[in-house]
Amino acid sequence: MSAFFRHKSFFIINLQWNQEYLNMNIAIVGTGYVGLVTGTCFAETGAKVTCIDTDANKIEGLKKGIIPIYEPGLEEMVVRNVKAGRLHFTTSLEGVLDDVSIVFSAVGTPPNEDGSADLKYVLEVARTIGANMNQYLLVVTKSTVPVGTANKVKEVICHELEHRGLSIDFDVASNPEFLKEGNAISDFMTPDRVVVGVESERAKKLMSKLYRPFLLNNFRVIFMDIPSAEMTKYAANSMLATRISFMNDIANLCELVGADVNMVRSGIGSDTRIGRKFLYPGCGYGGSCFPKDVKALIKTAQENGYEMRVLKMVEAVNNDQKDILFQKLECYYHKDLVGRTIAVWGLAFKPETDDMREAPALVLIHSLLRAGCKVRVYDPAAMDEARRRVGDSIYYARDMYDALLDADALFMVTEWKEFRLPAWGVMKKTMKQAVIFDGRNIYDGKELAEQGIVYHCIGK
């Protein structure tokens, strides 16, 4: 049972008497991953939430319970809160500003070519607010943004109010998200911490009121200044990315000196100063956060006359690591790859999502195609996304075993649960050559050797 469902009754029981909280009206601008999860979870705790997006087709779909992203448990929660009248969807931000006290900006901040965050959508939301607000509002940035963005949002709103000849009080705040794709609902409802950056007592009181159910349940809500809150998200993701790249560097060295990275990981993870999380070597990280946020923090440092030397190497190690399985394949077949059939299990950057942004599988597939290989792929959730990104140059298998037909090797790239205990006998009969390159170290090499399967992994 997830942590969220263990605590679900808390929110329902305690909010029955908390009419003040039940009367809270908030708006969430952007119905992407962050916006939709945030809005739906706030509605689940009892607040009245309106989610806004400029994509009319997406909004109409959401009204019907059609979810544009893959996230376990989200569809059921959206449908439940729409039926309860707590969750609404619209294309008009202007139409809801008179009815809400807090507006969350959860729009995209895609990277520019130089690695900096593109703030055009964030600032467009600010312009719309300034051009249409008629009462006090707390404008909260939920998107991952560089330090100083809140000041830019404030300037844009002030400019629009001056253009209208109005003087209306408002506050800005930063409330970065720390959601993991595939576990977002539990992350939101039972958080390690909630970080809130404010610059006025009024804003702090309003955010405290919004997060009251979490405070009552003893979850940590940490208030700080806005620049520190903005920096916290980038620093957190960059630290996690650093741990991954460090362990990949250690794993590669282990192979050269005859050490076993799994034993090394156990040894250092037992040190309470280090801990066991994010110490797993593999074929590189991807997704919508780590690559983008590392680049953005490097760029922020450059803009302020400083060089993030560690993060530059974190990025370099990760880029190299995404090609590590292909290099092992080249070595095994002495670069004789033309015409060989290679199976790929796992396309999303991690399990329990269909997100393929910066996914290691994309790098591997393109390397295989350039080498003249035939590629057969399977992923429980990301097949449609793969078709959109890769097209018809690869074969999209019906299931995990169909991907293995006549394969000269298997790349295990994303550690979905269904890949962890395959039928080894079926694999051997289906593959032309029973060779596995395990990019997540999920298999037991001794067991595979007993099965007559050639096994290569990371770091030993």
Regions found by a protein language model. Give the residues of each.
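Structural/interface elements that position substrates and couple domains in central-metabolism enzymes
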Residues: 21-460
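Aromatic (phenylalanine/tyrosine) cluster motif
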Residues: 4-5, 10-11, 21
